[in-house]
Amino acid sequence: MRPGYIWAVITKEAQDLLANRLLLAAVVFPALVFAAIPTAIVAFIEVNELDPDQIGQIEQYIRQFPDLSVKLAAQAFIVLNFMAYFLLIPAMVPMAIATQSVIGEKTARSLEPQLATPMEVSELLIGKAVASAVPAVLATWGVFVLYGLVNGAITQPEMTRLIFNDVWRVAMLTLVPLICLLSVLLGIIVSSRVNDARTAQQIGGFIVLPVIGVAVAGFFSGQATFSLEQVLIGDLVVAALIGVSLVIGNWIFDREAILTRLG
């Protein structure tokens, strides 16, 4: 593994991304949408009085926050429950960058010079994966910080402290980057076998299904957030899947076959 080759790939991919403003906007916009929905609900609750019937419907959920007022507890449940969807951002957004990275280069015939170099396939994969994952990670972190500050400003400072809890700080620093890398690797692997970006994104999009399942299950179970143990287990599982994806990608990303098709 030669860091110089990996850095060269990262630099090239970063330049291509910065030159594509539409793709760059696609990194930030979904994250803002996911954050805006619960924030709008919180703002609505803040300016309206809760109906007693509504309180009865959500009583089982707000019991998790016995030290908060009823209104703030309802807002806290909404805000914390929707945070599971922050894991969708690193699962979905990098896929668009990764598929464009391979399929766009195959179409523009700029992938061929990279494959013709003495660079190892693993070095190319890691370089493209890191370059595609970093923007999504930074976007997720940025929107997460904004999410905490804005909701705290709408309600009370206590809300910001609830959002920036230990579990979600660990999840942001470990699980989000790992999910990004896994999503990117799967996108690159799929893109190496097909020639249409939409097809690659649809196939690779299956990675978001388990995340959606976790988010929905958490909502209906009444649990507003994950435990630290669940996050750490998720880290181990995703890290193992990344290792498997690298092995499979090194095997599937057939340099000679791609060069033959491009030729």
Model regions and ranges:
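A structural motif at transmembrane helix-loop-helix junctions in multipass membrane proteins
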Residues: 18-25, 160-208
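Selective transmembrane-helix segments that form parts of the transport pathway or gating/packing helices
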Residues: 89, 119-148
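Hydrophobic alpha-helical transmembrane segments of multi-pass membrane transport/permease proteins
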Residues: 19-52, 81-95, 207-218, 240-245
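Extracellular/periplasmic helix-loop-helix junctions in multi-pass membrane proteins
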Residues: 193-201, 216-236
